[in-house]
C-alpha cells in the first residue's frame, strides 16, 4: 500500500495544469503614465517655440529682406557702427561699397548692414508732412 501511495504522489507531482485564457491582460497604467509624462514636455517645447524660435526666425527674415533690398545712394549703418552712403552694390559676390567721408570708401559684406537709416528719415519726414497738412487743413476749416 505504501508503494501505491508513492506512485500516486509521483503522478500528482508530474501533472501540470494548463489554463486557457481568451485575452492577455494589458497593463494600461504604464501606457497612460507614459503619455501623461510626455504632455509637460510637449507644452514646454510649444512655449519655447512661440516665445523664442518663431520671433527670432521672423527677425532673421526681415533682416534678409533689408539686406537684399539695399540700393545705391542709401544711407546705412553697419554692425561696427559706421554710417555711410552706399556707392556700389555688387550682386555676384555679396559685397557693397560704402562712402564714409569724402573720397573715403570701404568695402563691406551686405550682411554687415544693420539698418538703412535713409528709409527711416523718409518715413519720419512723410509723417511730419502729414501732420503739417492736417494742421493747415484744420486751420483753414476754422
From Swiss-Prot:
It is a single-pass membrane protein. GO terms for cellular component: plasma membrane. Disulfide bonds: none annotated. The chain crosses the membrane at residues 33-53. InterPro entries: Preprotein_translocase_YajC (IPR003849). It is found in: Cell inner membrane. It comes from the Bacteria. Its main location: membrane. Residues 1-21 are annotated as: Disordered. Keywords: Cell inner membrane, Cell membrane, Membrane, Protein transport, Translocation, Transmembrane, Transmembrane helix, Transport. GO terms for biological process: protein transport. Belongs to the YajC family. The SecYEG-SecDF-YajC-YidC holo-translocon (HTL) protein secretase/insertase is a supercomplex required for protein secretion, insertion of proteins into membranes, and assembly of membrane protein complexes. While the SecYEG complex is essential for assembly of a number of proteins and complexes, the SecDF-YajC-YidC subcomplex facilitates these functions. Part of the SecDF-YidC-YajC translocase complex. The SecDF-YidC-YajC translocase forms a supercomplex with SecYEG, called the holo-translocon (HTL). This is Sec translocon accessory complex subunit YajC. It comes from Rickettsia typhi (strain ATCC VR-144 / Wilmington). The lineage of its organism: Bacteria, Pseudomonadati, Pseudomonadota, Alphaproteobacteria, Rickettsiales. The gene is yajC.
